[in-house]
């Protein structure tokens, strides 16, 4: 079975991947059949280059992409194009649909960037608000406060009153010395027998 997957290249802490068609039993960086593209995850935005014809060929011959490669191929629109061709659409219809898809993706990307920039702007505003509040609070705290004269108040202490509460005496029921429980008797017998 053939897989379309990533093959690591590049140096330490700077990964660059080749997108390859390889036998599913081959190790990750081992033998492969063909290089069909490149992927650079460290670039901003990520760079994906595909040989669309070769990827389409391998997928039509039964090659299965891994989940990561599938998402990369999906972002380029190749999966959508292959699906349209499989449904029997003409080349003109496929080209028209792909153009619509590209526009839709551009709108999504722009919307996502707008949301990110709006969040950054709100964060900056929120960070600026406490600074403004501190600037306003500083002069208010430094302003001298006029103290009003305190009126003297006479404190009258009331004499102590003793109140005796009527406590009802509850007669306690006499505890009758009951016979020890049978378990206790059995234990006493065992102790006496051992000695």
From Swiss-Prot:
Residues 171-195 are annotated as: Disordered. One of its GO terms (biological process) is translation. It comes from the Bacteria. It holds the Pfam family Ribosomal_S16. The keyword Phosphoprotein does not apply. GO terms for cellular component: cytoplasm; small ribosomal subunit. One of its GO terms (molecular function) is structural constituent of ribosome. Keywords: Ribonucleoprotein, Ribosomal protein. Residues 171-181 have a biased composition (Low complexity). Belongs to the bacterial ribosomal protein bS16 family. NCBIfam families: S16. HAMAP family: Ribosomal_bS16 (MF_00385). This is Small ribosomal subunit protein bS16.
């Amino acid at each position: 079975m053939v897989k379309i997957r990533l093959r690591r290249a590049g140096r330490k802490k700077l990964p660059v991947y080749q997108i390859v068609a390889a036998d599913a039993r081959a190790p990750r960086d081992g033998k492969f059949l063909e290089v069909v593209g490149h992927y650079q995850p460290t670039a901003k935005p990520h760079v994906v280059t595909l040989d669309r014809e070769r990827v389409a060929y391998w997928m039509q011959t039964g090659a299965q992409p891994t989940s990561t490669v599938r998402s990369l191929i999906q972002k380029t629109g190749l999966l959508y194009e292959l699906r349209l061709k499989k449904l029997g659409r003409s080349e003109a219809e496929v080209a028209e649909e792909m153009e619509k898809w590209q526009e839709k993706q551009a709108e999504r990307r722009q919307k996502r960037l707008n949301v990110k920039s709006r969040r950054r702007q709100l964060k900056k505003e929120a960070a600026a608000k406490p600074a403004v509040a501190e600037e306003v609070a500083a002069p208010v705290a430094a302003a001298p406060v006029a103290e009003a004269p305190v009126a003297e108040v006479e404190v009258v202490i009331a004499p102590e009153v003793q109140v005796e509460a009527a406590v009802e005496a509850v007669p306690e029921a006499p505890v009758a010395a009951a016979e020890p429980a049978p378990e206790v008797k059995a234990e006493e017998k065992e102790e006496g027998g051992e000695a």
